[in-house]
Amino acid sequence: MARKSKLPLLLVPLLLCQALVRCSSPLPLVLNTWPFKNATEAAWRALASGGSALDAVESGCAMCETEQCGGSVGFGGSPDELGETTLDAMIMEGTTMDVGAVGDLRRIKNAIGVARKVLEHTTHTLLVGESATKFAESMGFVNEDLSTSASQALHSDWLARNCQPNYWRNVVPDPSKYCGPYKPLGILKQDIPIHKETEDNRGHDTIGMVVIHKTGRIAAGTSTNGIKFKIHGRVGDSPVPGAGAYADDTAGAAAATGEGDILMRFLPSYQAVEYMRGGEDPTIACQKVISRIQKYFPEFFGAVICANVTGSYGAACNKLSTFTQFSFMVYNSEKNQPTEEKVDCI
């Protein structure tokens, strides 16, 4: 009896590709939150010039820091309640799982650059505050004022509006009517109203970026100046691995943007990557993450971008009356330019 020929399993996809003629991979891939086109281009240029996925993430986020994307990245934006602009950033390498991050970074413009120095020159993951600034100076970064006339004007206007909105609660004087300094609300003073956050959804436009190199190596990163009028010393989700962004060469990568104080409680980027590891499509993975948060905070402002190891990507956002679509940027080998795409919120 004649023996049946058995083709190696790995050869079958190749033959199928040849039969279909077109078999190009979508890699490399650059994916980032919001329509920050120049950041996407900067990351792609880094790849085109022979750079790594990590190089591309750093270049893309650095471009946004320089251009002050949306007023919510880089210097001169989102003054805290003392009028100071501080920065958060993170960069993660999905092959080694190495991470470098900075939070509440002061007087240093290139936050993503400092984050990479943390990754490359320390065994730590996150440095914060004045100590992060001292580290940056030791790495050669220039100490300079991050405030601008625009950020100073924002702060002055906020003070004139009795410090509204702010992020205090259960304190006296009533934070919904007055500026601080505040003290804890005593047990016998519960008749004083508890302040609720009233800030609109603008100003949360963190750049989150995912890059997959043509070799399959993955990196992700974030950069932001946080939320306007935050309490001095506040650190958001952006520099927290698994919250702001997450990368793993064996599964994919994700990045989040929005209300960091809520997002970080759910580690959305990590969770999205784990969904993709389990076989979920990137869009479904992003949607599942948003749905998990909706159960507890139905009115939260946030979005997530996701990409798996094949270069397939997706995004999702939480639908609000003032936020029904989320825009993000894509650049891969099948496109000849950075392309803005939109997804309807759920």
UniProtKB/Swiss-Prot annotation:
Glycans are attached at residues 38, 308. Heterotetramer of two alpha and two beta chains arranged as a dimer of alpha/beta heterodimers. The keyword Signal applies. Disulfide bonds join 64-69, 163-179, 286-306, 317-345. Gene3D superfamilies: (Glycosyl)asparaginase. It is found in: Lysosome. Residues 1-23 form the signal peptide. It comes from Macaca fascicularis. The keyword Hydrolase applies. Cleaves the GlcNAc-Asn bond which joins oligosaccharides to the peptide of asparagine-linked glycoproteins. It catalyses: N(4)-(beta-N-acetyl-D-glucosaminyl)-L-asparagine + H2O = N-acetyl-beta-D-glucosaminylamine + L-aspartate + H(+). GO terms for cellular component: lysosome. Its EC number is 3.5.1.26. Keywords: Autocatalytic cleavage, Disulfide bond, Glycoprotein, Hydrolase, Lysosome, Protease, Signal. Belongs to the Ntn-hydrolase family. GO terms for molecular function: N4-(beta-N-acetylglucosaminyl)-L-asparaginase activity; peptidase activity. Cleaved into an alpha and beta chain by autocatalysis; this activates the enzyme. The N-terminal residue of the beta subunit is responsible for the nucleophile hydrolase activity. This is N(4)-(beta-N-acetylglucosaminyl)-L-asparaginase. InterPro entries: Ntn_hydrolases_N, Peptidase_T2. The gene is AGA. GO terms for biological process: proteolysis. Substrate binds at residues 234-237, 257-260. Its main location: other. The active site is at residue 206.
